[in-house]
């Protein structure tokens, strides 16, 4: 079978390797689609701090089960699935308390261990989640980023009836906003400086879309929600400007959830956060229940994934996909790799 390998930043080869043998607690998955995310792009540019080369990528994935290990009874051949890419120890304090996304030894497929970018992939059945027959493989490959959004939204607890502001209308911000709406938020406003991303947000059914190049964030919140502003602000851009806006304009005593990852040390006014008694939360990846909730939201028509797909590439055009993203950063939301044809 063919397997993708990034040998060095910006260099991809394909090698012929044997189809993996399935161990007793594993399933063999024919990989159908893989999504490329921001972290993959960091690897492509040699800027991911926790990835060494060579590495086989692929952590946003969908596929079809083709073989079962002898102990696997909960799945069947031909079943559509996605794969949870976390590899955790199971013994550290977070793992023992159900928070394996915070494992002290956490590894992620495609970064610190072999990813799914091959025609077939053997994986522990515990890391496989079924997707509905009606869901496309392209959508299935986007359940992973949706799980990121679901987990992030849940950091506020129950968002039903709340007014919510989302900073950043990229793929994760868009999905956070859609998830909040799907979970019953009263009103959701999303902001960005890209009219294209805001138009995509509008297409996905997000209530209020504001370009903060043209309108002050604080003013936009009052217009959207009234003088009480938002109950929670989700920062899905992750820079000093957006986090600074969140802290400056948040209602006193309200909550800010940092969903995005800062590229460096943050320079924000924590004195204001302290003075306003802001509850600043963070979020890290996801757990299994976030996958289940994400799939349910898509299946119920409350989250729309297909509008986020900007372009698809054949498996052997993996490098061209990265080049396309570099050349079209302002207009690209999600690029999908077609590993196999159904």
Residue ranges of model-derived segments:
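Mid-domain Rossmann-like dinucleotide-binding core that forms the NAD(H)/NADP(H) cofactor-binding site
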Residues: 135-214
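Residues in the short beta-alpha loop(s) of Rossmann-like NAD(P)-binding domains
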Residues: 47, 193-194, 262, 286
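Glycine-rich cofactor phosphate-binding loops and adjacent beta1-alpha1 units
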Residues: 156-160, 199, 204-279, 319
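NAD(P)H dinucleotide-binding glycine-rich loop of Rossmann-like/cofactor-binding domains
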Residues: 89-167
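N-terminal glycine-rich cofactor-binding segment
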Residues: 3-21, 38-67, 82-83, 100-114
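Glycine-rich beta-strand-centered segment in the early N-terminal region that forms part
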Residues: 20-34, 47-93, 127, 132-134
């Amino acid at each position: 079978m063919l397997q993708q390998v990034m040998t060095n930043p910006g260099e991809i080869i394909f090698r012929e390797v044997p189809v993996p043998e399935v161990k007793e607690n594993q399933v063999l998955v024919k990989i159908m689609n893989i999504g490329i995310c921001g972290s993959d792009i960091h690897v492509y540019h040699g800027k991911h701090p926790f990835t060494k080369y060579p590495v086989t990528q692929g952590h946003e994935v969908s596929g079809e089960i083709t073989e079962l290990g002898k102990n696997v009874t909960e799945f069947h051949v031909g079943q559509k699935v996605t794969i949870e890419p976390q590899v955790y120890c199971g013994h550290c304090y977070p793992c023992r308390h159900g928070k394996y996304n915070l494992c002290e030894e956490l590894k992620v497929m495609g970064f610190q261990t072999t990813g799914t970018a091959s025609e077939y992939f053997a994986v522990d059945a515990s890391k496989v989640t079924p997707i509905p027959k009606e869901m496309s493989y392209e959508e299935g490959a986007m359940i992973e980023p949706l799980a990121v959004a679901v987990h992030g939204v849940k950091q506020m607890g129950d968002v039903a009836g709340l007014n919510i502001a989302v900073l950043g209308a990229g793929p994760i911000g868009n999905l956070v906003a859609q998830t909040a709406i799907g979970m019953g938020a009263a009103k959701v406003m999303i902001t960005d400086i890209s009219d294209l991303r805001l138009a995509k947000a509008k297409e996905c059914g997000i209530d209020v879309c504001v370009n903060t190049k043209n309108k002050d964030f604080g003013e936009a919140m009052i217009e959207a929600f009234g003088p009480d502003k938002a109950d929670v602000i989700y920062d899905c851009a992750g820079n000093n400007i957006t986090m600074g806006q969140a802290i400056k304009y948040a209602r006193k005593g309200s909550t800010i959830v940092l969903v995005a990852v800062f590229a460096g040390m943050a320079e924000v006014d924590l004195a204001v956060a302290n003075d306003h008694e802001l509850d600043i939360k963070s979020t890290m990846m996801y757990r299994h229940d976030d996958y289940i909730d994400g799939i349910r939201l898509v299946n119920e028509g409350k989250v729309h994934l297909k509008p986020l797909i900007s372009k698809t590439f054949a498996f052997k055009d993996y490098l061209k996909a990265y080049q396309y993203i570099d050349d079209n950063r302002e207009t690209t939301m999600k690029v999908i790799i077609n590993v196999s044809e159904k």
